[in-house]
């Protein structure tokens, strides 16, 4: 048991998405910034950005530019920001953040500042697609939101649900950052629904599954108003989003025909799924018998404990109580592990997983695909050589997702 827990601990606490060398330079840059060695801080940031390449986030560029400004080297700050202004992941929020960033105030009197802002605005506009936000459900006095991204050209009338969840955290920032990865669908006429769920740590995985089912039903029920065909709905996601997508793809088609809300009287089934590096079996995490469902310490270290903090309402006290009974937790664990729900009537499923993934073991997709084959479910599986837990590592294979939906959402 000790060895099992240790392996799970090591797996869950590994860095998530970028090479450790880049992280080391960022940590060094942060430390140098604190002691006001701004020039060497900027140099360290630059090296981290160089190593991380095209996956470098907005905040790293901002930090590097800030250090160059404080080192009295505005030319280097403008150089970095001009690189950022050409980034095809830039959002409108990024533009607003650059425009108002106190760290960049010293550049605002420079004649190059307005040119920079214009370039950032132009790129952010080019990266944007028509969109509309909807409240797809309500709970605990709050609304559940989804954003419909619409193609700039003619719609093909088909829908792809994109599950916005990483480590079972879900928020609107993921929506903004995720538009870049949805271009392959939007440019071929798909409508993409970016679904935000009740997020951990407040809501656990079973709550998120119910939210996602509600989202599918909402889209299907309102298909005409949304401009899509209710019988051509696919689902996609990565990591936790991939896990939740597979839960939906393998779920049965139970419909509550007596539900008071008509939205809840329609199906939550999808017609195809495509996912990246998904967790599929919480009882065999990396190898047989490594159950992570009840290992609280490693879950806390990996910042996913809230996702497994199962709670039930005590109607007498009106208090949500944590489920601590092992038998009860194991029952829930099986219900949220899609590998145990695979059946011959499941829709076509496409999975890409890297063999260098140190967050979700490759074994999770291997055993799941074996189960799909055993059940006769149409599937496609790509093991990306050298691929880590990062969607950018999955290219160009990731671009095959749209072909999958083209084929199975006919």
Task: Describe the residue ranges of each PLM region.
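Mobile cap/lid helix-loop segments that gate and shape the active-site cleft of serine hydrolases
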Residues: 254, 289-341, 347
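Histidine-bearing beta->alpha loop at or near hydrolase active sites
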Residues: 199-200, 384-391
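N-terminal cap/lid segment of alpha/beta-hydrolase-fold proteins
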Residues: 119-154, 205
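Short beta-strand element of the alpha/beta-hydrolase
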Residues: 156-167
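Short amphipathic alpha-helix adjacent to the substrate-entry channel of hydrolases
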Residues: 173-193
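Alpha/beta-hydrolase active-site loop
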Residues: 203-224
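Short beta-strand/loop motif that positions the catalytic acidic residue
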Residues: 345, 350-353, 357
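Primarily recognizes the serine-hydrolase "nucleophile elbow" in alpha/beta-hydrolase
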Residues: 217-292
């Amino acid at each position: 048991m000790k060895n099992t827990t240790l392996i799970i601990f090591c797996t869950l606490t590994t860095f998530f998405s970028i090479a450790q060398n880049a992280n080391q330079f960022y940590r060094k840059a942060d430390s140098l910034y604190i002691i006001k060695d701004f020039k060497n801080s900027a140099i360290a940031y630059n090296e981290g950005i160089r190593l991380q390449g095209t996956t470098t986030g907005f905040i790293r560029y901002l930090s590097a530019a800030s250090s160059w400004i404080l080192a009295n080297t505005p030319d280097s700050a403008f150089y970095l920001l001009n690189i950022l202004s050409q980034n095809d992941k830039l959002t409108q929020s990024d533009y607003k953040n650059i425009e108002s960033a106190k760290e960049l105030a010293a550049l605002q009197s420079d004649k190059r500042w307005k040119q920079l802002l214009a370039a950032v605005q132009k790129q952010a506009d080019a990266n944007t697609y028509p969109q509309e936000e909807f409240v797809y459900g309500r709970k605990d006095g709050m609304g559940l939101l989804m954003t419909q991204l619409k193609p700039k050209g003619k719609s093909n009338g088909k829908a792809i649900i994109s599950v916005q969840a990483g480590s079972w955290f879900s928020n609107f920032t993921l929506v903004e950052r995720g538009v870049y990865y949805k271009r392959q669908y939007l440019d071929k006429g798909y409508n993409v629904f970016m679904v935000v769920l009740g997020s951990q740590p407040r809501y656990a995985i079973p709550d998120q599954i119910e939210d996602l089912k509600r989202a599918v039903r909402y889209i299907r029920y309102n298909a005409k108003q949304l401009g899509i065909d209710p019988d051509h709905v696919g689902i996609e996601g990565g990591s936790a989003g991939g896990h939740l997508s597979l839960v939906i793809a393998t779920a049965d088609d139970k419909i509550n025909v007596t539900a008071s809300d008509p939205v809840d009287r329609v199906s939550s089934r999808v017609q195809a799924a495509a996912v990246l590096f998904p967790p599929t079996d919480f009882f065999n995490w990396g190898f047989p018998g490594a159950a992570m469902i009840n290992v609280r310490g490693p879950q806390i270290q990996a910042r996913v404990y809230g996702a497994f903090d199962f709670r039930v309402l005590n109607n007498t006290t009106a208090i949500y109580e944590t489920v601590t009974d092992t038998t009860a937790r194991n029952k829930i664990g099986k219900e949220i592990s899609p590998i145990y729900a695979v059946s011959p009537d499941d829709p076509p499923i496409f999975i890409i997983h890297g063999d260098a993934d140190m967050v979700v073991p490759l074994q999770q997709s291997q055993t799941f695909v074996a189960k799909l084959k055993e059940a006769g479910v149409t599937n496609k599986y790509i093991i990306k050589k050298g691929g880590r837990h990062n969607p950018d590592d999955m290219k160009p294979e990731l671009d095959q997702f749209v072909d999958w939906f083209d084929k199975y959402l006919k």
